[in-house]
Amino acid sequence: MKKDDIQKFEEYCSSVYEAFNSPLNINWEMNEKSLIGFFSIGSDYYKISCLRYDFNIWTYKFFFLDKNKDEFSQTSKGDTNNKMKVLSTIRSGMEYLINLKNPNGLIFMASDDSEARKKIYFSFAEELEKKFKYKLLSNRKENYQIYILYKNIDLDLVLDEIDKIKNEI
């Protein structure tokens, strides 16, 4: 490799690292049972939906505004140049939820063909497990991978609650 190529690669890696560690500002709306966040980058709009269930178990979902349908969708799209900032913001939102609501359980999932996204979400789950002293359980079926973080609660209670709300996850 030429010296210029190495320098370009290092600059690229540096910009990716910076974007991944620079979350966007999230505008939050909250009440006792929900925490809803909105953020945008360029002309793309995103929504984070966190809902509280029994035993202080929370779900965390991420949506992209599909401008063609004028509705939020869980299908991830948007400007690929901004993926790292969006992922950084998703991670930041998870930490905000944990710091604010101290959930006994946090449930989120990846539900598409992207293997990379599943790996990134798993790394988020591992970070949160260590940082906030959760236990982590993850399971995959077809294109769906669920991530369950829990503490201060019996796993059976978490699984029973998931069984009740599985259509909403």
Q: Language-model segments: what does each one mean?
A:
Residues 1-169:
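Non-catalytic substrate-recognition and accessory regions of acyl/acetyltransferase enzymes
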